[in-house]
Amino acid sequence: MDMTVLTSYFNMESLDSLKVTMGGGIGSHLLNVALGLVMFGIALGIKPANFVNIIKNPKSIITGIVCQIILLPALTFLLIIACGNLLSPMVALGMILVAACPGGNVSNFITSLSRGNSELSVSLTAFNTAVCIFTTPINFALWGRLYLNYAGNHNIGSLPQLEIPFWEIFQSIVIIMGIPLVLGMLCAHYYPKIAEKLNKPLQRLSIVVFVAMVVIIFASNFKAFLDCIAYIFIVVLVHNLLALGIGFGSSSALRLPYKDRRTLTIETGIQNSGLGLILLMNPNIFPKEVAGEATVWASNGGMVVITAWWGVWHIISGFTLAYLWRKRGRREPIED
C-alpha cells in the first residue's frame, strides 16, 4: 500500500489540528498540582540508601540509566526515521517528548507486582527523576532538532520551527517535580511512619490521576479521537514495545539477574507522560500564539494525543507484564 494512502487513512492532519485544552488556566493548575502530589508520593519511598545503591550495585543501575536516558531517545529517533511519512511531524515530536521524560510514577508499584527488584526500581526512579531537570530538555532539543532537519530534507509534512526554552522547561520541572521530591524525602526521613502509610495509597492514586487527565483531554475531542484511534493505538503500541524491548534486551545481553531484567523492562517501558502533558500545556514552552497570531504549536494535537495515550497504554502493558510474570513464576537463572 502506498504511504500516502496510509497517512490519509489514519487522518494525521485532523489529529494534529485537534484543539486540546484542560479547562483553561484552572485545569492546567490542577494538572500541575496532581503531578506534584504524585511526585510527593514517589519521594515517600525514596531514601538516601537508594542513591548509595548506585555505587553498591552499579551494573544493573547503570544499565537502567543508559537504557532510559540514552538508548530510548536514540532508538525512538531511529524508529521515527524508519516510519518516514507514516508519522506527522507533531506525532513524531510527541514520541520524542515521551522518550525524553523520566520513568513513570507507577513503575515501582508494577515492579513489586511482577516480583522484580523493588530496591533497584526505586533507585532508578530516584536518579532519573533527579536528573530529568537536565536530561528532558536536552534530549527533546537534541533529537527533536535532528528529526526536523531530517524531515525538512525529505519533505515530511508541515514542519515547525523548534525553539526549546531550556530555562522555562528547567523551571517548570523544578517546581512540579523537584520541590515535591525534596519535601517527600524530608517527610520520609523525619516522619517515616506517616510516609509508610501514605506511600501505597498515593501510588494507586497516581493511576487514577493519569486516567482522569486522559479522559479530560479526549472528552472535548471525542469524535476526532475515534477517527484516529487505530493510528494512535498502533503508534503507541510499537513505541512501547520498543521501550520494553530495550530494557529486556539490554539486561539480558548483560546477563543480569532475572529480577533485575524484569525491573529494567518495566522502568524503560513506563514513562512519565504526565510530565510531558504538563510541558505541552505550558504556554511559555509551547505558545499557541504570539502577538495575536497563531504559531505552529497551535496545531500540536498530535503531540498531546500521543503523549496522553502513552499515559494509559503503559499502565495496561505494565500490569499485563506483571500478571504474566507472576503467573509464570519463572525462577532467576543460576549465576556463575
How does the language model describe each region?
Residues 1-336:
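Alpha-helical transmembrane segments of multi-pass small-molecule/ion transporters
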